[in-house]
């Protein structure tokens, strides 16, 4: 897909959202079932069943997916798609690219070993390694726009309002 095809594909969608802003609000959903046997949660991904369990650093076997890894994978996927889309739109040729996300966790927090230790990622690093002849000013713009438009990056960075409920079934 080139820049013209991307614009042609997105133009009617953008027009719709401009004329009807409420149409742009969509609720994405994820659902999982708690395993009755092991310490795991089966997540319906739409393509396959992903079973998440404890990370080996918290006593897991390593056979199930780690939710922390899944968060980083979602960031990599979203950032990669956004980067490619923006590169196409601003006509930055990408021969190849690698997107890497790393996050630092102190597992003492989630295990309740140290009440002062944070639960969750203390730091996340996102890196793009791109093979392109584009000049540095275009790469700077590409990075700026990728950060601006990546849904997962912006969600992690800005911490949305979140609510948690529990109900008996």
Language model feature labels by segment:
Residues 1-73, 85-169:
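Extended beta-strand/beta-hairpin segments
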């Amino acid at each position: 897909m080139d820049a013209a095809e991307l614009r042609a594909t997105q133009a009617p969608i953008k027009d719709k959202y401009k004329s009807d802003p409420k149409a742009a609000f969509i609720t994405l959903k994820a659902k999982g079932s708690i395993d009755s046997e092991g310490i795991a949660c089966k997540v319906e991904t739409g393509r396959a069943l992903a079973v998440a369990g404890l990370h080996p650093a918290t006593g897991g076997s390593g056979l199930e997916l780690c939710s922390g890894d899944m968060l980083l994978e979602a960031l990599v996927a979203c950032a990669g798609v956004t980067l490619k889309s923006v590169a196409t739109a601003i006509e930055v040729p990408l021969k190849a690219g690698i997107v890497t996300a790393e996050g630092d966790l102190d597992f003492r927090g989630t295990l309740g070993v140290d009440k002062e230790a944070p639960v969750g990622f203390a730091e996340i690093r996102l890196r793009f390694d791109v093979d392109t002849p584009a000049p540095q000013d275009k790469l700077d713009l590409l990075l700026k726009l990728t950060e601006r438009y990546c849904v997962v990056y912006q969600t992690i960075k800005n911490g949305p309002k979140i609510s948690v409920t529990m109900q008996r079934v």
